[in-house]
Amino acid sequence: MVQKLEKFQMALGVIFLSIFFIAILVQIVTRYIGVSVIWTEEVANYSFIWAIFMGAAVMVNRREHFSFDFLTQKLKGKKRASLLTVIDAIVAIFAFFITLYGYEAVTTFWNYNWLSLPELKMGYIWIAIPVMGVTMLIYSLNHIVSHIKVLLNKEAV
């Protein structure tokens, strides 16, 4: 399930990164030919936000965020699993608060409108925060379960 979630989230990130790229391209071309298209900047900014947040959550699952891993590289077995459990618990707590406060941001800004496209609500942008938080929490809890299996000798290191 976690791998399917990651693939979906990665695909979503790629879609938003593609929208970002296309919006920037449209902006460059229209400026070159002297036509003013005002919505491209907002579309580029907001699609980039979604792409970054989806990618950040995937990086939690893949453990690709910047970290000081000297100690985790030196430890083996149950000691390493214990340390990784603590680290993932901290990430899970952080993800919980991102979800909680992200939800508050969504409810606060839901009815605000985009400047260039007033038909669209800002809530669609802000919802990326709790989506990222929930998926980070799922990934962290999945890691914790794996570490607990190692600690209980149910899985090899």
What spans do the regions from the language model cover?
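Alpha-helical transmembrane segments and membrane-interface helix-loop junctions
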Residues: 1-157
